[in-house]
């Protein structure tokens, strides 16, 4: 397949104009405009671990690798091409994700729109019109809402911060630094009485990337008050009968790391001190995605070991911090959803920090925050993991992840390790309501974990229950060699 003429001028090339040119060129199968104004386009996005991957499925990623000067002709590395492409796509301000259908079996792809004010290949810079259909109305269970005090009067929020410039080289350099190979007054309340959404609604693609809603919304007024933080949790709320304050679930307690796991965060040779914040040598790359009732409203990749999620940038509680700002809910179509979301955002604040091989969270304000790993929300009663105010809590341990990833590679573990964390603001997770029904949901994905998980999949590991999968990984996959070598030295 012919490549674009601009490939080769890597030093002067910018990703945004290059991608627009590629979409218009018609050279890449599945990469095309899908609206007459040429503001919305689709990108083929088949997972590298699928058996039916062909060269045409990765052609656009390979083309950018060549254009950006990252292509090595003697080694075909589709996963690396795709990672480079994804990092470039996220770091530019020119595009926004409309639909993620990468999990679709027949035609995996993603749909992007050219951001307002950015000219397309025809020079038009008008806004994207009609790309997103109106969102379904609010599904709200008043028992789920959790505030310590009555929210104050709402004010309009501030636009979210711009995406940060992230490059794969940062990940590569940190991995090399660790001697790890990169190769290898209560308002009137309402509750919905119609059909509940499916548990996996967030994963089901709709025509506009939003949640499929019921045909008819039936609302009824509720007499019971909003659940406050100083009230006991009854059977109708988030806890058990007669329960008081929500304890952190003991099921989710992280065991103490073994000496071999500790070694994952130490260089075999003396190394300079870790960067500020002491993240244990791990790259501080964290994908943060914000959803308002199942609809993605913001996404950012934070390259700092510390950040604060907040709504008001001038809030003294978050002064002089790296901010990830919640978008204003003013554009939400449902007035009840808009009001409740605004009330929660006014009293929401959370600090995240990667330190000593862990991801730590501290609630800063009145809005309660519950957290869970994605697999804990797939069936049964989810854990009642509550972040207490001004108390630092470990919500993810990278050492546990590395141990589980090794076991997954060696077929000692059927399921892949879980590295996706969900945070729910003002509502607790429930087995009867999907997470997509929550007013404010935040998804966290550490890039370190995603990168190494993809490396294992490239080596042949699969989360399918295959039973007798033979895993043959390259000798250069030093993450696990490091563990095994340490075991040999200490036995």
UniProtKB/Swiss-Prot annotation:
Pfam families: IRF (PF00605), IRF-3 (PF10401)
Expression (tissue specificity): Widely expressed with higher expression in lung, spleen and intestine.
InterPro entries the UniProt entry points to: Interferon_reg_fac_CS, Interferon_reg_fact_DNA-bd_dom, Interferon_reg_factor-3, SMAD-like_dom_sf, SMAD_FHA_dom_sf, WH-like_DNA-bd_sf, WH_DNA-bd_sf
Domain of life: Eukaryota
Similarity-based family: Belongs to the IRF family.
Function: Key transcriptional regulator of type I interferon (IFN)-dependent immune responses which plays a critical role in the innate immune response against DNA and RNA viruses. Regulates the transcription of type I IFN genes (IFN-alpha and IFN-beta) and IFN-stimulated genes (ISG) by binding to an interferon-stimulated response element (ISRE) in their promoters. May activate transcription by complex formation with other transcriptional factors, possibly members of the STAT family. Binds specifically to the IFN-stimulated response element (ISRE) but not to the IRF-1 binding site PRD-I.
Cross-referenced PANTHER family: INTERFERON REGULATORY FACTOR, INTERFERON REGULATORY FACTOR 7
Designated name of the protein: Interferon regulatory factor 3
UniProt organism field: Gallus gallus (Chicken)
Encoding gene per record: IRF3
């Amino acid at each position: 397949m012919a490549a674009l003429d601009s490939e080769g001028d890597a030093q002067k090339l910018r990703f945004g104009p290059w991608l627009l040119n590629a979409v218009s060129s018609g050279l890449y199968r599945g990469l095309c405009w899908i609206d007459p104004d040429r503001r919305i386009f689709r990108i083929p996005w088949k997972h590298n671990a699928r058996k039916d991957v062909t060269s045409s499925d990765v052609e656009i990623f390979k083309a950018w690798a060549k254009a950006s000067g990252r292509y090595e002709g003697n080694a075909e590395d589709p996963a690396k091409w795709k990672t480079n492409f994804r990092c470039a796509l996220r770091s530019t301000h020119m595009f926004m994700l409309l639909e993620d259908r990468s999990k679709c079996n027949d035609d995996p792809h993603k749909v992007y729109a050219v951001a307002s004010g950015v000219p397309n290949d025809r020079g038009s810079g008008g806004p994207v019109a009609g790309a997103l259909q109106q969102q379904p109305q609010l599904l709200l269970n008043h028992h789920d809402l959790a505030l310590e005090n009555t929210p104050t009067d709402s004010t309009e929020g501030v636009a979210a911060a711009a995406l940060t410039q992230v490059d794969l080289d940062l990940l590569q350099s940190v991995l090399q630094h660790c001697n790890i190979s990169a190769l290898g007054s209560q308002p009137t309340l309402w509750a919905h009485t119609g059909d509940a959404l499916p548990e996996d609604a967030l994963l089901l693609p709709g025509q506009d990337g939003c949640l499929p809603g019921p045909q008819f919304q039936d609302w009824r007024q509720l007499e019971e008050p909003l659940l406050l933080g100083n009230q006991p949790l009854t059977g109708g709320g988030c806890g058990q009968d007669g329960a008081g304050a929500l304890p952190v679930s003991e099921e989710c307690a992280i065991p103490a790391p073994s000496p071999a796991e500790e070694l994952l965060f130490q260089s075999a040779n003396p190394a300079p001190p870790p960067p500020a914040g002491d993240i244990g040598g791990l790259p501080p790359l964290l994908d943060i995605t914000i959803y308002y009732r199942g609809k993605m409203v913001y996404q950012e990749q934070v390259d700092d070991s510390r950040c604060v999620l907040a709504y008001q940038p001038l809030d003294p509680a978050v002064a002089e911090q790296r901010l990830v700002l919640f978008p204003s809910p003013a554009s939400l179509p449902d007035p009840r959803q808009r009001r409740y979301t605004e009330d929660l955002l006014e009293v929401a604040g959370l600090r995240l920090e990667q330190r000593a091989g862990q991801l730590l969270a501290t609630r800063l304000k009145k809005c309660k925050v519950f957290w869970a790993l994605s697999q804990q929300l797939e069936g049964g009663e989810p854990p009642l993991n509550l972040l207490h105010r001004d108390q630092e809590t470990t919500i993810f341990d990278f050492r546990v992840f590395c141990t589980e990833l090794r076991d997954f590679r060696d077929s000692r573990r059927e399921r892949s390790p879980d590295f996706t964390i969900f945070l729910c603001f003002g509502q607790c997770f429930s087995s009867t309501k999907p997470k997509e029904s929550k007013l404010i949901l935040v998804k966290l994905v550490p890039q370190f974990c995603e990168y190494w998980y993809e490396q294992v999949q490239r080596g042949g590991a699969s989360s399918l229950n295959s039973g007798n999968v033979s895993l043959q990984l390259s000798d250069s996959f030093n993450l696990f060699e490091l563990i095994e070598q340490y075991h040999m030295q200490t036995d």
